[in-house]
Amino acid sequence: LSLVGSEMCIRDRYIALPFALLNVLAFHSDETASLSQYNAILPLSIFIFNWVNDTGAYCTGMLFGKHKLFERISPKKSWEGSIGGGIFCIIASFLLSHFFPFMSTGVWIGLALTVVVFGTWGDLTESLLKRRLGIKDSGNILPGHGGMLDRFDSAILAIPAAVVYLYVVSLF
């Protein structure tokens, strides 16, 4: 019973902690005014980059994909698709930097690339877990989409990585 309880605790933290970190991106303290300001753009940008990366990787991989990324884990992902997804995210980061200039273009590009790398890693990690457990989908709440975890697997590693990236960038 304690093994089941600890497994549930780890699972819940694995999913809940990254999404709780979205608050770090959304709320910014203003020391001069002694209050916090809310900005939804940074948390939303993580999801935009994830969606652009997934869509760009899928389309590029379908057109040009020849070299498998990690065939044993996710047989349909290719290096060409992964690079294509990254290129589409860089384009999206230029657009975001134009419409939301509170960060430089370079910081937006760095954020996009951070999300690409860690989002892909999160997707592969979840695919590996499912493969090891012998399950196809992580749930049936979204028929044909593999479950809720499949919709957000990229964000589970991308959000903490984005928080660390933006914190490190703010130090320099």
Predicted regions and their residues:
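Single conserved hydrophobic/aromatic residue that forms the stacking wall/gate
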Residues: 1-10
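Hydrophobic alpha-helical transmembrane segments
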Residues: 11-56, 61-62, 67, 71, ...
